[in-house]
């Protein structure tokens, strides 16, 4: 862990090694490609539409979500600390002609010159990969405008999530490389909401996400036992 930055060097290194396959729909990031339509729809519908809005994607990686939000007409900036994923993201945007901006920085660094600058902030599948998730949540709160939405997604920490996400997805189904996740870093919904409550953000909605290995598709569910997303809003002043 860096002393100055909220970064886990080992986590960054894992995703640097896999970066070349980020946009392969049948590669190591296949689950993200399968999940993306669901999370994109949730963000778009819950926020009242992304078209014309200024959006920040925290922990954007290779840009799967960032690019899809830009395709809906959002003015998107994606930030990440991985050099290789960002290079992949920039190259793919050039190849596909999608206009958006990528920067290498932490959420805390980006906040210094972007307070209350965004209509929507997304932080998806990222909190379980940093040493201090509360610090990221606070930075996201500071960067969204009053009345704007901040979205988080992560994985619950319990026996079922260990069986499905690590034993199932990494070891049995080979959906993800072994070691992608650390069960000890998963975040219970109560813990996430407790952290959100330490900021100005108000939790407005939560939904679970479940995977069907037979059809290879994700769908919404009322259960937040494994994967889940929450929508928060910053109150108007």
Curated annotation (Swiss-Prot):
Query: GO MF terms on file?
Result: 2-polyprenyl-6-hydroxyphenol methylase activity; 3-demethylubiquinol 3-O-methyltransferase activity; polyprenyldihydroxybenzoate methyltransferase activity
Q: What is this protein called?
A: Ubiquinone biosynthesis O-methyltransferase
Q: Which GO terms describe its biological process?
A: methylation
Per the record, the domain of life is Bacteria
Coiled-coil region(s): none
Looking up HAMAP family in the UniProt record yields: UbiG (MF_00472)
Q: In which pathway does it act?
A: Cofactor biosynthesis; ubiquinone biosynthesis
Species this chain originates from:
Shewanella amazonensis (strain ATCC BAA-1098 / SB2B)
């Amino acid at each position: 862990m860096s002393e100055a930055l909220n970064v886990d060097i080992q986590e960054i290194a894992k995703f640097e090694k896999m970066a070349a396959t980020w946009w392969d729909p049948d590669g190591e990031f296949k689950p993200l490609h399968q999940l993306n339509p669901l999370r994109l729809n949730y963000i778009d519908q819950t926020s009242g539409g992304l078209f014309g809005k200024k959006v920040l994607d925290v922990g954007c990686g290779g840009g799967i979500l960032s690019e899809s939000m830009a395709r809906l007409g959002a003015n998107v900036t994606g930030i990440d600390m991985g050099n290789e994923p960002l290079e992949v993201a920039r190259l793919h945007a050039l190849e596909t002609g999608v206009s958006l901006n990528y920067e290498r920085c932490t959420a805390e660094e980006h906040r210094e010159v972007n307070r209350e600058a965004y209509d929507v902030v997304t932080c998806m599948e990222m909190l379980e990969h940093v040493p201090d998730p509360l610090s990221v949540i606070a930075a996201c709160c500071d960067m969204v405008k009053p009345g704007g939405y901040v979205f988080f997604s992560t994985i619950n920490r319990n026996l079922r999530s260990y069986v499905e996400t690590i034993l199932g997805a990494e070891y049995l189904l080979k959906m993800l490389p072994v070691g992608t996740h650390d069960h000890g870093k998963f975040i219970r919904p109560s813990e996430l909401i407790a952290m959100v409550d330490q900021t100005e953000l108000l939790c407005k909605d939560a939904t679970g996400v479940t995977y069907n290995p037979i059809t290879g598709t994700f769908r919404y569910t009322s259960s937040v036992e494994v994967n889940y997303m929450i929508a928060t809003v910053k109150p108007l002043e």
